From Swiss-Prot:
Present with 2900 molecules/cell in log phase SD medium. It holds the Pfam family Ribosomal_L16. The keyword Cell membrane does not apply. Keywords: Mitochondrion, Ribonucleoprotein, Ribosomal protein, Transit peptide. Belongs to the universal ribosomal protein uL16 family. NCBIfam families: rplP_bact. Component of the mitochondrial ribosome (mitoribosome), a dedicated translation machinery responsible for the synthesis of mitochondrial genome-encoded proteins, including at least some of the essential transmembrane subunits of the mitochondrial respiratory chain. The mitoribosomes are attached to the mitochondrial inner membrane and translation products are cotranslationally integrated into the membrane. The lineage of its organism: Eukaryota, Fungi, Dikarya, Ascomycota, Saccharomycotina. This is Large ribosomal subunit protein uL16m. It comes from Saccharomyces cerevisiae (strain ATCC 204508 / S288c).
Length: 232
């Protein structure tokens, strides 16, 4: 049915799969199947799992997860209260930043957020009941102090980064601030924290002083008579 498949050579290259035909064939010659390995604001799911509305988390324990720069030199951080941001809003801010990143040498933009909550809506003046509404768009819950974007480049100046993030902030709801590697970590609306001031805790040293039942069981499981009965 497909005689040309026996004469086809497959060669995998970086960034995609290239199909090469030994005989002159206009359809298969130099045909490339593009593969996308980039960040996506709208996941391409065939079946969208509906979510509850939920609330934006309020961090009260001083957590700094996602609030520090991990890849670039400069970043954009949420300063106001936690908000919900849609995928379309993040994409508009992304486009505004990329206008300044593309001319840079080895310029790169890191996107720290992933829109993982499906928003479903129902029409206006709709009666109660009869199930949840249909899928409309993707969104993400962003708590206070969260890093949204990071940029870096060989010839990136701080003024250029500030202007890029300023324009990106106008596309997004909420109030944002410019951060660098020397900036303190925001853990609340009016509180900051320096991660270097936190003492480094060792799990084994702390449990050795006052061992718990769980820690004693871990030590006992390392004895040879118990290793014989593993994987049964």
């Amino acid at each position: 049915m497909f005689p040309y498949l026996t004469r086809m050579n497959l060669s995998i290259k970086m960034g995609g799969l290239t199909l090469k035909e030994s005989s002159p064939n206009a359809f298969l010659n130099n045909t490339t199947i593009a593969r996308r390995f980039k960040h996506e604001y709208a996941p391409r799911f065939k079946i969208v799992q509906k979510k509850q509305k939920g609330r934006v988390p309020v961090r009260t324990g001083g957590s700094i997860k996602g609030s520090t720069l991990q890849f670039g030199k400069y970043g954009l951080r949420l300063k106001s209260e936690g908000i919900r941001i849609s995928a379309q809003q993040l994409k508009e801010a992304d486009n505004a930043i990329m206008r300044y990143v593309r001319p840079l040498n080895n310029g790169h933009l890191w996107r720290r957020l992933c829109t993982n909550v499906a928003v479903c809506i129902k029409g206006n003046e709709t009666r109660m009941g009869k199930g949840k509404g249909g899928f409309d768009h993707w969104m993400v819950r962003v708590p206070t102090g969260k890093i949204l974007f990071e940029i870096n480049g060989d010839d990136l100046h701080e003024k250029v980064a500030r202007e890029a993030f300023r324009k990106a902030g106008t596309k997004l709801p909420g109030v944002y601030e410019f951060v660098s590697l020397d900036s303190l970590v925001r853990v609340g609306l009016h509180s900051f924290k320096n991660p270097k001031d936190d003492p480094v805790k060792n799990f084994y040293d702390e449990n050795a002083k006052k061992p718990s039942k769980k820690y004693l069981n871990i030590l006992k499981s390392q004895e040879p008579q118990y290793k014989l009965f593993r994987g049964r």
